[in-house]
Regions:
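N-terminal Rossmann-like NAD(P)+-binding subdomain of aldehyde/semialdehyde dehydrogenases
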Residues: 1-133, 327
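Residue-level signal for inorganic ion chemistry
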Residues: 31, 67, 89, 170, ...
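Structural signal for hydrophobic packing residues in well-ordered secondary-structure cores
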Residues: 53-56, 60, 75-82, 86, ...
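Glycine-rich phosphate/pyrophosphate-binding beta-alpha loops
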Residues: 42, 153, 278
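Short, solvent-exposed beta-strand edge segments and adjacent coil->beta transition regions
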Residues: 32-34, 92, 142-144, 254, ...
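General structural feature for long, well-ordered alpha-helical segments within catalytic domains
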Residues: 44, 48, 52, 66, ...
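Rossmann-like NAD(P) dinucleotide-binding subdomain of oxidoreductase/dehydrogenase enzymes
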Residues: 79, 123-267
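ALDH superfamily catalytic-core signature
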Residues: 231-344
Length: 344
């Protein structure tokens, strides 16, 4: 049976890629291949940048209140398509239903923030800052921004943290969707178009490191926003800074818990489990180090074991599942190796 080949989204249209390189997309709960995403060619990435640049003058001229109205429409459409978006996140990322729904809801909340763009864009002024001088600060859009998206939050990060505020403030955007979880991004692209976002204001591609470097080096891209691992974040920040671009790189965290002897044991363990096991541990909020006061260490471990054994493991689309699969096989094998190391 032929496998669905995803398109890329540029200038308001979904287009077939001319690439020879494709990424297999899997349902983590079953392992089945559910489609293929293109590794867009350099020409296709340049096409997306050009579309964003061409759309910028007209979009920045749209009054802020009109851009805010479009954000309200996007928010409305997210709610209308909540079930479809949640299923997409669950089936391509592996989050259980409640986690996938939370991912989409966070995208909605980021969009709600963007509806307040008239307030966000307000400047400041100070008359007579010194004799004969007044100071005035304006906030203005800059141009084309690029968002580089991780695999673990296909909805919240690109369409909650990145795109809404960026374009609501009058900028345009090229989103590099995660190559293993791009389907949700394409659903959001449809929503943005239906909401009335003009062609070229938002563009979505999937590509490799080489094409990302094209984005980082391109003079028409004024800023970069990235979420992902620290090694990659450092390289992106260095390359973007060398090209004179604004850049924010949110990298991986190392979270710790310190449990004292007087802690409420059941509630504390429940919090530790939620942090460590939520999203199968594939998030920057995941707890990776827990230090317990010696006086309660044995009781803590017993309670942790008890609560962990009660977690229902199951497929992501089953609304009763509380722990879903690792997103892709490479990380699954790394987790098994770490477990073996711990047992040894």
């Amino acid at each position: 049976m032929a496998v669905e080949k995803l398109q890329y989204f540029v200038n308001g249209q979904f287009k077939d890629s001319k690439t020879d390189t494709w990424y297999d997309l899997h349902n983590p709960s079953t392992g089945e291949i559910t489609g293929q995403a293109p590794c867009c060619t350099e020409e296709e990435v340049l096409e997306a940048i050009a579309a964003a640049k061409a759309a910028y003058p007209g979009w920045r001229a749209v009054p802020a209140i009109k851009r805010a109205q479009i954000m309200y429409k996007i928010r409305e459409l997210i709610m209308e398509h909540m079930e479809e978006l949640t299923m997409s996140v669950a089936c391509e990322n592996g989050k259980v239903w409640g986690e996938a729904e939370g991912d989409v809801l966070k995208a909605k909340e980021g969009t709600e923030l963007a509806t307040q763009v008239p307030s966000l864009m307000m400047g400041e002024s100070l008359m007579d800052a010194s004799r004969g001088y007044d100071t005035v600060k304006y906030r203005e859009p800059l141009g084309v921004f690029a968002g580089i998206v991780p695999v673990n939050f296909p909805a919240m990060i690109p369409f909650g943290w990145m795109a809404p505020t960026c374009i609501a403030c009058g900028n345009t955007m090229v989103l590099k969707a995660a190559s293993l979880t791009p389907k949700t991004a394409m659903l959001f692209a449809k929503i943005y178009k239906e909401a009335g976002v003009p062609d070229g204001v938002i563009n979505v591609v999937t590509c490799s490191r080489n094409e990302i470097n094209t984005i980082l080096d391109h003079p028409d891209v004024k800023g970069i926003t990235f979420v992902g691992s620290t090694p990659v974040g450092l390289k992106i920040y260095q390359r973007a800074a060398a090209a004179g671009k604004r850049c924010q790189a949110l990298c991986q965290a190392k979270n710790h818990a310190l449990v004292m002897a007087d802690a409420a044991l059941e509630r504390t363990v429940a919090g530790v489990i939620n942090s460590a096991y939520g999203c199968a541990g594939q998030r920057c909020m995941a707890l990776s180090c827990c230090v317990v006061e010696e006086a309660i260490a044995d009781k803590f471990v017993e309670e942790l074991k008890k609560q962990a054994q009660q977690i229902k493991v199951g497929p992501s689309w089953d609304k009763s599942s509380k722990l879903g699969p690792i997103t892709y096989e490479k990380h699954y094998k790394e987790v098994l190796a770490d477990i073996d190391k711990g047992v040894a």
